[in-house]
């Protein structure tokens, strides 16, 4: 055989037809190949081999699962959903399969596991490979675990943050001051962003806000905003919105400001490890990438919130301020009350309804949501120089009261693609107080779980509507909260969950 | 609907028919279910949900992968090979799918991640869940990472070792002295076990040796032995072999002496992390479970061996002796030279060939392998009381020289199922010296990598045959080593790897 013919032969030995299996492996790209396929046999691939898949100009590293079975046709490479989306091949396109390049950055992960400090070069190498999708879930888990707790010192956290900024897009708004906010951890119903952005933008500041969808909660800010307007904007559409209105509230995932963070989250979610360094790097890298200069961090503290003590909040807050300074962000903190849900609704549409009530100045609008939003907006107005120190809150209240914030919110929604009607659910179940007394505590985590079982955030109108707050007196039989669901089955499922748990609302019987 | 009918309805909602997908996910049980199946819909399962699968009296915890696609029939639960073997269902058997029970022991893993000490109760809880298959690969990775390096102190290592012994079988040989040996870490070609066991057994000691397959190396002792005789013996067959011959060399995994170790290894292999505590617990738990009383630990030291300095060997050795004492094992150490490969072959069949040459007293047998085996056998003969102190080496040499060891080895192979022929490969490539000089150093790790890329240990005949040793003079063009492969693709791949690396053999040009 000539050299040319041999090379051609060799190329053919490493090609298979792309086939979409529809298997959702969460985000890890997996390729399914028959053990008797020409590629496995000629290359000596076995299960767990890390392989490089190439389709046209796109490539992705995937983990191989070898298959013995006829459901996978001969000559095809079955792709998991993550692999399919990474390659985006035409139907029946050729996929070239080869060994994944050696991952030299794993030596840094090992060094960190063994307790050594990593320098900026090491973090750049690791995060570069992570963002490029070269780490398997196991490698990601080792890296996340090795950095968990307080294992990253200040300079390591700075280096990690810079590395995460470096691999993403970085927006430039051509303005001296660009404000932003972030709320750490879950507090059901805490949708202040949808109020803060229009208030602040109405005062002339620039606030291009990217928000996340729910990861483990019944609604993320992006999910709630999506009830009212499109949020899947690309960077060009986001830019048009901000240039026209001074603000936006879009989904961060579609602008991919921090691609490394998008990857790390896939193991952080199931592992559920607290990691101060990674939290700081995740938050601040996205703010820096969004082109922000001044960032307000809202830290709700409570026994069932993410941050459980004021000391923990202060320690985390210090780290956020220090790392922010190192990467050129001015960070300010507000430690807030995280004892109970904010507003009444928990779930995208129910929360959107609360937001609209506040913006429209309705008499029945939840006052806690309004007060929280005004305090945060006031802080940002002062931070961004739109109000003298001490008068931000007053300015924010004026702008909300006189309808400028509501007008600005409508303008933002229009610019993002049009204001939408809030949907409602057909199936509801009211949960009432078993005894008379006073509401002593509310378990935020279990309440959030009930809202998810009722269908939130997949069914945007589903969730929980809360009717009583801590300290409220209640009569036996008085409604405490209402489950909202899109289907009878989901209502049943959430209702059964609530019935079989200790009460979500603790009622202390009065003497 | 009556309560009874409703309960029946609910039971039916959680059942699917078992279907074997043939997908090899290495060892993690995965269940594939259609997103529109009744179970996903009624239970709210999503991808990555940890579910409990029950088929008849057997159950297993698996990770769910949701599928959109018609290759998976409606109403079936597709099982990965690991899930299929764990449940062993009849064809079309009903599988009940429910949420996996809460894993309380994860709180201990998190505590360890955050740097806290774990007590015996914590290790028992974690290892109990690990051995029962309740940990996903991500949880295993977090645990292994959190215990890596020197993160386990002495009492934690003792507790981990005891916990690992407690979940496995523990053999009882009814004899006062049962000897064993273990070699720490990789030294390519170091197959002294296949020589030590027959020598020691020929002198009347009992040595029921369980060995591992390759984890990250081109051959484990069990892989090499399997070239010569079956090693997948169950405990009854192992017992028959030892009762008949005084020794055996079997695969530890098939007798499941340390089921927790068998599970941990599935993430340790790809992560490739060093962990003193886990190494000690892994080694000693298997020795204790095998019913050993006296254990010789061979610690090869060299710049590219697993243990790189005499100090590191002594520190690890102390830990092995201390933990051994705590669990009732008498542990003795021999620190050996780990500068270069032992024998000539690297890979199961090539190593087996070297072993046979030594046993048969062939003139071309590798002397380094022979000398190493004699020293270790001599130590064990003294440790087990079969030779007075100082005369073990001489006795070992006599038994090897007069053919008693070879006869014993053949008896052991026969008892294990029959002595086999050693296979050879069709594809070979000779790597030669680029310059004349003297061999100054050999990179064991890169050499092992080349042997693996050539196909070892999956292709037992594949690997590397080494033709020169440190200190040998070589001419330019003289063969240094030969790659052996079962397929042209693998030979090509290994050859390309060798060509594009710095030379594996360092040749210092003579003045």
From Swiss-Prot, chains A, B:
It catalyses: thymidine + phosphate = 2-deoxy-alpha-D-ribose 1-phosphate + thymine. Pfam families: Glycos_trans_3N (PF02885), Glycos_transf_3 (PF00591), PYNP_C (PF07831). It is an enzyme of class 2 (transferase). GO terms for cellular component: cytosol. Its EC number is 2.4.2.4. GO terms for biological process: pyrimidine nucleobase metabolic process; pyrimidine nucleoside metabolic process. NCBIfam families: ARCH_P_rylase, PRK04350.1. Belongs to the thymidine/pyrimidine-nucleoside phosphorylase family. Type 2 subfamily. PANTHER family: THYMIDINE PHOSPHORYLASE. This is Putative thymidine phosphorylase 1.
């Amino acid at each position: 055989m000539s050299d040319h013919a041999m090379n051609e032969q060799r190329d053919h030995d490493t090609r298979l037809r792309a086939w979409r299996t529809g298997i959702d492996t969460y985000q890890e790209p997996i390729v399914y190949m028959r053990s008797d396929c020409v590629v496995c046999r000629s290359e000596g691939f076995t299960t767990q081999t890390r392989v490089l898949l190439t389709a046209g100009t796109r490539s992705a590293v995937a983990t191989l699962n070898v298959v013995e079975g006829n459901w996978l046709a001969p000559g095809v490479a079955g792709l998991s959903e993550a692999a399919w989306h990474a390659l985006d091949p035409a139907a029946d396109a050729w996929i070239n399969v080869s060994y994944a390049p050696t991952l030299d950055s794993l030596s840094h992960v090992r060094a960190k596991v063994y307790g050594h400090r990593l320098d900026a070069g090491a973090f750049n190498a690791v995060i570069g490979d992570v963002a490029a999708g070269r780490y398997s879930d196991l490698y990601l888990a080792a890296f996340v675990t090795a950095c968990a707790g307080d294992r990253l010192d200040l300079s390591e956290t700075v280096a990690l943050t810079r590395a995460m900024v470096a691999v993403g897009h970085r927006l430039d708004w051509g303005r001296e001051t660009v404000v932003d906010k972030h709320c750490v951890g879950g507090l059901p119903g805490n949708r202040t962003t949808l109020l803060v952005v229009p208030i602040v933008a109405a005062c002339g500041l620039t606030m291009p806000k990217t928000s996340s969808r729910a990861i483990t909660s019944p609604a993320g800010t992006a999910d709630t905003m999506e009830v009212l307007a499109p949020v899947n904007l690309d960077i060009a559409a986001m830019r048009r919105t901000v240039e026209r209105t001074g603000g936006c509230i879009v989904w961060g995932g579609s602008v991919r400001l921090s691609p490394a963070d998008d990857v790390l989250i896939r193991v952080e979610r199931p592992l559920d490890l607290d990691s101060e360094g990674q939290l700081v790097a995740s938050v601040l890298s996205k703010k820096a990438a969004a082109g922000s200069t001044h960032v307000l961090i809202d830290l709700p503290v409570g026994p069932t919130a993410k941050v459980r003590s004021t000391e923990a909040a202060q320690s985390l807050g210090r780290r956020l301020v220090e790392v922010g300074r190192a990467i050129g962000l001015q960070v300010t903190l507000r430690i807030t009350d995280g004892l109970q849900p904010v507003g009444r609704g928990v779930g995208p549409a129910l929360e959107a309804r609360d937001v609209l009530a506040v913006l429209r100045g309705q008499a029945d609008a939840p006052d806690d949501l309004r007060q929280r939003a005004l305090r945060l907006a006031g802080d940002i107005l002062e931070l961004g120089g739109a109000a003298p120190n001490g008068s931000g809150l007053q300015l924010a209240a004026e702008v909300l009261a006189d309808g400028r914030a509501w007008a600005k919110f409508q303008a933002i929604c229009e610019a993002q693609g049009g204001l939408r009607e809030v949907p409602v659910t057909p199936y509801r179940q009211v949960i009432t107080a078993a005894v008379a007394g006073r509401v002593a505590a509310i378990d935020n985590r279990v309440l959030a779980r009930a809202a998810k079982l009722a269908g939130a955030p997949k069914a945007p109108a589903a969730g929980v509507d809360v009717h009583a707050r801590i300290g409220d007196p209640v009569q036996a039989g008085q409604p405490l909260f209402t489950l909202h669901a899109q289907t009878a089955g989901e209502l049943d499922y959430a209702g059964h969950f609530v019935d079989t748990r200790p009460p979500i609302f603790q009622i202390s019987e009065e003497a």
